[in-house]
Amino acid sequence: MASPGPAAGMQQKLEAAAAAAGGGDGAEWGRGMQKMEAVGAGGEGVGAGAEQVAPPPRRPVAARKERVCTAKERISRMPPCAAGKRSSIYRGVTRHRWTGRYEAHLWDKSTWNQNQNKKGKQVYLGAYDDEEAAARAYDLAALKYWGAGTQINFPVSDYARDLEEMQMISKEDYLVSLRRKSSAFSRGLPKYRGLPRQLHNSRWDASLGHLLGNDYMSLGKDITLDGKFAGTFGLERKIDLTNYIRWWLPKKTRQSDTSKMEEVTDEIRAIESSMQRTEPYKFPSLGLHSNSKPSSVVLSACDILSQSDAFKSFSEKSTKLSEECTFSKEMDEGKTVTPVPATGHDTTAVNMNVNGLLVQRAPYTLPSVTAQMKNTWNPADPSADPLFWTNFILPASQPVTMATIATTTFAKNEVSSSDPFHGQE
């Protein structure tokens, strides 16, 4: 016989409890029975197996979000009125969040970036305290790279003078000049030759080599430690300095340039007025003068510099300074310059007092000793005998050659061997 289920056993217990209690309200009894049946049904379900329970419903999967666009794409999609949300309102200018300066950058697409293995690189144009100065630096660099047709911050008419100047130098040199005008120019190695940096005070020293007969000449207030420089100033750099020092020209030369431009203008007007309307138009010959007019002389930068008053005064001061230094050195060393009789050679003799002895020295030819020869040979101290010195000093008319030196040495050996005291020594 099968054992009763858990629901039947629970019902029997409830009936027994109700009988013991002496009955009760029928409604309450019915509600209790319904609850117990529900509990029994749940117990049977658990006992029958948990695999019959339905899983809880899942949340609906949300749709994937769209790809977030980059900062450059957002800025490019902004209208002109919303451009103030960027760090700067100008093109090619960004504000550094740490230093607060405005940096100008340029993207050069014509080069290949080997570090990142892609086309194009960012060109740094310097950091500026003023936002407008950084924007103008970007405009100048963009005009140098892409010409007057590119998009810039300010009108092209503001850079009419700069467009003429930037055509005379290379792109690399022009970018260096822009960086040097920035507010945060780094004191690193110099870009140009002739500007060595001093290690003790971090200053630049403009030097010229082989100028006016001097091996080294400093144009700055401080002299370098080792007296060397990076190279000759401006000789190996292909930069036209004529436009930089044109204001050093005399007034007459400036007036001639102005008159030349006026002559060209008058010539154009005369040609245009003489032409008839029926004739086909021809371009006038600009700047071509007739044979009667003298041709203008083209002056280079060196010519302008050599003709200027500043260069002449500079050369005079340097010559005077070198003479004073030479005279002071001679006075310190105890030298006196004395003239020498004319012997057919342009020489100067210098008498130097060394331990009471008179030694005569000449830079090119050595005159003969005119002292009276005396036979006062002393083997202990031969320097008092003039014959001892005649073996070393040649006559003024005899050129110095290798054969002469060999002959003089041989004569000295003969004198030494003929000495009666030579064998005793």
UniProtKB/Swiss-Prot annotation:
Effect of loss of the gene: Reduced size of various organs due to decreased cell size, increased cell number, and abnormal cell arrangement and microtubule orientation. Brassinosteroid (BR) loss-of-function phenotype with semidwarf plants, reduced length of internodes, erect leaves, up-regulation of BR biosynthetic genes and decreased sensitivity to BR.
CC terms in the record's Gene Ontology section = cytoplasm; nucleus
User: GO MF terms on file?
Assistant: DNA binding; DNA-binding transcription factor activity
Q: Where in the cell is it found?
A: Nucleus; Cytoplasm
Processing and modification events after translation: Phosphorylated by GSK2. Phosphorylation of SMOS1 leads to its degradation by an unknown mechanism.
Q: Which residues carry this modification: Phosphothreonine?
A: T338, T343, T347
Tissue expression remark: Expressed in the apical region of leaf blades, young leaf sheaths, a broad area below the shoot apical mersistem (SAM) and near the tip of primordial leaves. In developing roots, expressed at the tip of seminal roots and lateral root tips. Expressed in developing nodes and basal region of internodes. In flowers, expressed in lemma, palea and anthers.
Q: What induces it?
A: Induced by auxin. Induced by brassinosteroid (at protein level), but repressed by brassinosteroid at mRNA level probably via a negative regulatory feedback loop.
Instruction: Recite the UniProt keywords alphabetically.
Output: Activator, Auxin signaling pathway, Brassinosteroid signaling pathway, Cytoplasm, DNA-binding, Nucleus, Phosphoprotein, Transcription, Transcription regulation
Q: Which PANTHER family match?
A: AP2-LIKE ETHYLENE-RESPONSIVE TRANSCRIPTION FACTOR, AP2-LIKE ETHYLENE-RESPONSIVE TRANSCRIPTION FACTOR SMOS1
Q: How does it assemble?
A: Interacts (via C-terminus) with DLT. Interacts with NSP2 and SHR1. Interacts with BZR1 and GSK2.
Purpose of the protein: Transcription activator involved in the control of organ size. Acts as an auxin-dependent regulator for cell expansion during organ size control. Binds to the promoter of PHI-1, a gene that regulates cell expansion, and positively regulates its expression. Cooperatively functions in a transactivating complex with DLT to enhance the transcription of the SMOS1 target PHI-1, and to regulate plant organ size. Interaction between SMOS1 and DLT is a crosstalk point for auxin and brassinosteroid (BR) signaling. Acts as a positive regulator of BR signaling.
Official protein name in the record: AP2-like ethylene-responsive transcription factor SMOS1
Q: Gene name on record?
A: SMOS1
